[in-house]
Amino acid sequence: MQKKAVLFDLDGVLVTTDDCHYRAWKQMADEEHIPFTRTDNERLRGVSRMASLEIVLEKAARAYSEEEKLELAERKNRYYVQLIRKLTDAAILPGARETVIRLREAGVLTAVASSSKNARLILTQVGLLDLFDTIVDGTQITKSKPDPEVFLKAAELLHKNPQ
């Protein structure tokens, strides 16, 4: 019998990094004198970094060049990485670790399929990295969700045909 596989998204499924994202965007926005609230942050869920930046810049008092936008996105990510380096297993969502462990004990292959370019760092910080047979992150794909590329790549690495 062929082994089954389960693919997990990262943020909002296994862990929560919402506050880290909010604080990083808020710091960057404050430095640029752009109003940014938790309500604004909700609009950024599931949106790529550059698309998120465009949403943040909707409230900016001035226009930004493409070069400036790239710098702002990089700055936000530097702040975000500083914050996720401080994550602990408290960021793991209830039942996530236990679910993955039970699946592995049952012989099911497991993978993380995340658009985040920081997925491995997050998994390492919270102590989940070793629970997965493969990890596909934003460094390995060209299209962000909702495009299925990240999930198809994870299935391919597990030698599975998606169903």
Predicted feature locations:
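Short, acidic loop-to-helix structural element flanking the phosphoryl-transfer center
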Residues: Q2, Q82-V112
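Residues at secondary-structure transition points
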Residues: T16, R43-V47, Y64-E67, E71, ...
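Short alpha-helical
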Residues: C20, S48-A51, E98, K117-L121
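Short acidic capping loops at alpha-helix termini that bridge into adjacent secondary structure
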Residues: T37-D40, S65-E68, D130-T134, P162-Q163
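A metal-dependent, Asp-based hydrolase signature
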Residues: G46-L83, P94, R102
